[in-house]
């Protein structure tokens, strides 16, 4: 049984600790009060942690309403954040207002943040072959680095790029 299938469990103690759990019925992350001991693993400190663990692999869900809002969801098949049209009600936890928000939540356990930066030559005039991770294509590609500044998406070998991203 998956952590995400477990019910909210306050535990036996009487502390008042606001936490989040994934509600299998609503397919969303909801607040509950944890007592401080026992309970189960369907308990997260933040809503984003809950979504990252339980929501990002859900299919997009339009819902029955007809607002037609442009939203983003994490597509578990392509492992990318993609646009979908949300009806405005009864969706699920895999729904984000922006692509950046989707990436920050759903990719947090997959790739470091610098893997989403573009290649950056920098202001210097050198000509050093380097590799960067191209998030759109999901692969490491060669680019020319000028020798200074730039960003962290910059690797001397394709292998080191692939290991990092």
Swiss-Prot record:
Which post-translational modifications are recorded for this protein? Contains 9 disulfide bonds.
Q: Which residues are glycosylated?
A: 23
Pfam families per the record? Kunitz_BPTI (PF00014)
Segments forming domain BPTI/Kunitz inhibitor: 4-54, 56-106, 115-165
Q: Which pairs are disulfide-linked?
A: 4-54, 13-37, 29-50, 56-106, 65-89, 81-102, 115-165, 124-148, 140-161
Which Gene3D superfamilies does this chain map to?
A: Pancreatic trypsin inhibitor Kunitz domain
Summed up, the tissue specificity of this protein is: Expressed in the tentacle crown. Not detected in annelid body.
Q: Which GO terms describe its molecular function?
A: peptidase inhibitor activity; serine-type endopeptidase inhibitor activity
User: Per UniProt, which keywords does this protein have?
Assistant: Disulfide bond, Glycoprotein, Metalloenzyme inhibitor, Metalloprotease inhibitor, Protease inhibitor, Repeat, Serine protease inhibitor
Q: Which InterPro entries match?
A: Kunitz_BPTI, Kunitz_BPTI_sf, Prtase_inh_Kunz-CS, TFPI-like, TFPI/VKTCI-like
* Region (Inserts into the active site groove of a carboxypeptidase and inhibits activity by emulating a C-terminal substrate), start-end ranges: 1-2
Specify which residues bind a protein according to the UniProt entry for this protein: 1-2, 109-111, 113
In terms of SMART domains, this protein maps to: KU (SM00131)
Which CDD domains would you find in this protein's record? Answer: Kunitz_SmCI_1-like, Kunitz_SmCI_2-like, Kunitz_SmCI_3-like
The record ties this protein, via SUPFAM superfamilies, to: BPTI-like (SSF57362)
In which domain of life is the source organism classified? Eukaryota
> Is Cytoplasm among this UniProt entry's keywords?
no
Asked whether the keyword Cytoplasm is assigned, the reply is no
Q: Which GO terms describe its cellular component?
A: extracellular space
Q: What does it do?
A: Potent inhibitor of pancreatic carboxypeptidase A with a Ki of 27 nM, and of the serine proteases trypsin, chymotrypsin and pancreatic elastase, with Ki values of 6.9 nM, 1.83 nM and 4 nM, respectively. Also inhibits carboxypeptidase A4 CPA4 and CPA1. Does not inhibit cysteine and aspartic proteases.
- According to UniProt, the name of this protein is Carboxypeptidase inhibitor SmCI
- Source organism of the structure: Sabellastarte magnifica (Feather duster)
């Amino acid at each position: 049984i998956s952590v995400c299938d477990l019910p909210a469990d306050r535990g036996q103690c009487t502390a008042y600790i606001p936490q989040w759990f994934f509600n299998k019925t609503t397919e969303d992350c909801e607040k509950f009060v944890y007592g401080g001991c026992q309970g189960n693993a369907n308990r997260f400190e933040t809503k984003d942690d809950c979504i990252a663990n339980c929501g990002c692999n859900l299919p997009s869900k339009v819902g029955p309403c007809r607002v037609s809002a442009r939203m983003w969801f994490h597509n578990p098949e392509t492992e990318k954040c993609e646009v979908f049209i949300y009806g405005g009600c009864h969706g699920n936890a895999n729904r984000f207002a922006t692509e950046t928000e989707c990436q920050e939540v759903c990719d947090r356990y997959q790739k470091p943040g610098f893997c989403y930066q573009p290649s950056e030559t920098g202001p210097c005039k050198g000509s050093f072959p380097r590799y960067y991770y191209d998030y759109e294509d999901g692969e490491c590609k060669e680019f020319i680095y000028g020798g200074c500044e730039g960003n962290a998406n910059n690797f001397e070998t394709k292998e080191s790029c692939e290991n990092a991203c």
